[in-house]
Curated annotation (Swiss-Prot):
Transmembrane segments: none
GO biological-process terms attached to the record: macrophage apoptotic process
Name listed for the protein in its UniProt record: Pleckstrin homology domain-containing family O member 2
Low complexity composition-biased segments: 229-238, 329-349, 367-386
SUPFAM superfamilies assigned: PH domain-like
Phosphothreonine modification, residue list: 298, 311
rRNA-binding in keyword set: no
Biased composition range(s): Acidic residues: 246-258
Compositionally skewed regions (Basic and acidic residues) per UniProt: 1-11
Organism, scientific name: Bos taurus
Superkingdom per UniProt: Eukaryota
Region ranges (Disordered): 1-21, 170-419
Alphabetical list of Gene3D superfamilies matching this protein: Pleckstrin-homology domain (PH domain)/Phosphotyrosine-binding domain (PTB)
Keywords linked to the UniProt accession: Coiled coil, Phosphoprotein
Amino acid sequence: MEEEGVKEGGQRPRSAQTADKAGWIKKSSGGFLGLWKDRYLLLCQAQLLVYENEDEQKCVETVELGSYEKCQDLRALLKRKHRFILLRSPGNKVSDIKFQAPSGEEKESWIKALNEGINRGKNKAFDEVKVDKSCVLEHVTRDRVRRDQRRRPPTRVHLKEVANAASDGLSRLDLDVPDSGPPVLAPSNDVDAAQPRETPRPPMPPAKPSPAPETSSAGDRMETPVGQSAPAPVPASSEAHPGSQEDLETPVVEDSDSEQPPNRILPDKLKVSWENPSPEEAPDSESAEPPQVPGAETSEAGPREGGKPPTPPPKILSEKLKASMSGMEASGPAQSPGASEASAPGPAEVSVNGVDDSPEPLQSSQAAGPPGTPPKAATTSTTLPPWDLQPQLHPRCSSLGDLLGEGPRRRRQPGEQLHRAQLEVKVASEKTEKLLNKVLGGESASVNAETLLSQAVEQLRQATQVLQEIRDLEEMNREAPGLREKRRELVTLYRRSVP
């Protein structure tokens, strides 16, 4: 510490030894005509003690430096006087204090010491830690009454309740049994109810056989329920014609394991004699009874449920076909026999998807013959025409090119239209079978046979025309070879770009 302000003859007291700074400084008494008096100053931490002499017997003033902002040099008129001032901080009611040092070095040392004291006074609240004994934190559970024994463990009943609430029917803990073995998971009622719905045999993996076995297997599937559901007895009239009994026999497709029952044999009334049947292929059956069609559809849908997803139901017939069919039904009874013969199309128009071209000669011969003569026997088959096999519109898997090609410009519509047209042709053939059964059975004797026959032929012709238009549209919508090459290049570029 500096002792320049202390008088030469005196010794420094003990309190001055513990002070930060001590010395003689002139202090202004304040007022307009302030008097400067010599005072002995002691700087202790954040307090400035003012004494009249070094004995420190009488303390004139105690200054709290925390109430002041700073200590700086005082610009006086006479620069030869080394004066400095303590500036109060705003909000305090203390007055500014002016000091005068004996030299410039003493003034600078006092300014520095007083500024340090001011900082200590400002930070006094942060440096000191006050502990208030009245604000003792109380423990949360300290006031709880202590028992002689600890808390008892949870009972088995409580554990059982918790297990029942947590398991929620998934896994139940058997707490009643003392052995507590592995739990037995009993199936619920929903699982038992759902078991009969499952198919008895799992679907076989898809194979790639030749088209001929597929046709034969499909024939087996369709022939089995038809033959088992309603086996018709052989009429007495068939016994009288042993020659025609041989014609009624149809070849039965045999599996490697078991033989299938023979097809349903129709009575003589429902048999249609076909002129010039083709020796290579058996003529398709258009004179089958209407109850056979739903049976065939159910037998066809049965095996498909196990292996493939069910196809969507057939859509409503088109407006064009509806209008044409209603128009023909309205104008059919009014037509003359000559007009029906003139409107009958040629063999090229009647053939649809490989259907035999022989209905027209049959119909003309039936109309020309006398009503009393019984029709000749002919071979019949319950196999459905090729349009019964619905095309698979949705492939099971698709390549990357197909995935990139799908979008707003995908061409799935022509295939759907083709399937829809095939269903329309199928409906027309069923109606034709109904009309032929009416004519041959003699149910409607008042209605002219030629009129009904002309209606059936016209319906077949319209269905064939719609099917041909849709096929032409599908050929027009085929993608160009350049577009396919472009798609392949895009797939190659995508595969190369994938890290």
